[in-house]
Regions:
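Elongated, amphipathic alpha-helical interaction scaffolds
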Residues: 1-290
Length: 290
């Protein structure tokens, strides 16, 4: 079944590349300055273990990487992808970050340098802004008498389609193509592709498939496989050509079916013969007659 799970998987695949991950961090946290380099990142086991009700349970981040300076961990960065607003997102992120701090507090890690955990929530919606809680205080029902003693937790939320154009153009990796697409769809309700060369072709086209629900992007992967200097402009030309061809084939089929229906109504062909010539079941052919 294709759906949100597919989107999640494809987003993870693109962002797992260090050049894409570092690009996202540098633009969103450091205003485009190249602070985090590709070779300073290492993958984190995306599963955090919690013990609840006497049972061991696993939580899964979308993607996370350690940022190193030599052998010292400077930070752990996590990315959480959202295609629609989610009410409980502050709790989820709080749980992920908390689990990493608990890990650092374990006895076997007592002598290790302690590092901060930073999670970025990337919202990919372009039809509406994020309209759900962004912090624990917005989510929790807190008695005012105890509120001064409750620690708030605010998400680092980035609404990609709503970033300034200047910020969008700071991205240097394939993530720019996604950000540009989301921005254009929000502002113009349409997308005009540029001539930027795609580095991770398969992953980006799978992501575009999941985001747009247009499976012609996925089918185009084999057509461009092995080619150098593939751009979104070329990809869209191929996608459009597929659409035209599909329309032509459907038009021919519709014309053929209409002729067969006339022959059936004139008593020249039986429904069984007409259905056979149309390469469909009798039940489906009868639906056309109705």
């Amino acid at each position: 079944m294709r759906g949100n799970k597919e989107k999640d998987i494809t987003q993870k695949t693109l962002e797992m590349y260090n050049d894409v991950f570092a690009d996202i961090i540098n633009v969103l946290l450091f205003n485009g300055e190249k602070v985090v380099t590709e070779d300073s990142l290492t993958d984190v086991l995306q599963e955090s273990i919690l013990k609840m009700d006497g049972r061991i349970r696993a939580q899964y981040r979308d993607i996370a990487k350690y940022w190193h300076n030599s052998k010292i961990k400077l930070s752990m960065f996590g990315l959480e992808n959202q295609t629609k607003p989610e009410k409980l997102m502050p709790l989820r992120v709080f749980g992920y970050d908390g689990a990493e701090y608990v890990q650092q507090a374990k006895k076997e890690n007592s002598k290790e340098t302690k590092y901060p955990v930073i999670t970025l929530v990337l919202y990919f919606g372009y039809n509406c802004r994020w309209n759900q809680p962004k912090s624990l205080f917005e989510l929790l029902d807190i008695d005012e008498r105890i509120k001064p003693y409750v620690n708030d937790f605010k998400m680092n939320l980035f609404e990609i389609a709503y970033l300034d154009r200047e910020k969008i153009d700071m991205f240097k990796s394939d993530f720019w193509i996604l950000a540009d697409y989301l921005y254009q769809m929000r502002v113009n309700k349409d997308y005009v592709a540029g001539d930027t060369v795609i580095k991770h072709v398969d992953e980006l086209l799978m992501l575009m498939t999941a985001m747009t629900r247009d499976y012609r992007f996925e089918k185009t992967i084999n057509e461009v496989k092995g080619k150098e200097h593939v751009t979104m402009c070329e990809v869209l030309d191929r996608v459009e050509a597929r659409g035209i061809e599909k329309g032509r084939e459907e038009g021919i089929k519709e014309g053929t079916v209409n002729v067969l229906i006339s022959l059936v109504k004139d008593g020249i062909l039986s429904i069984a013969d007409a259905a056979k010539r149309a390469n469909m079941s009798e039940e489906n052919f009868i639906q056309y007659i109705k």
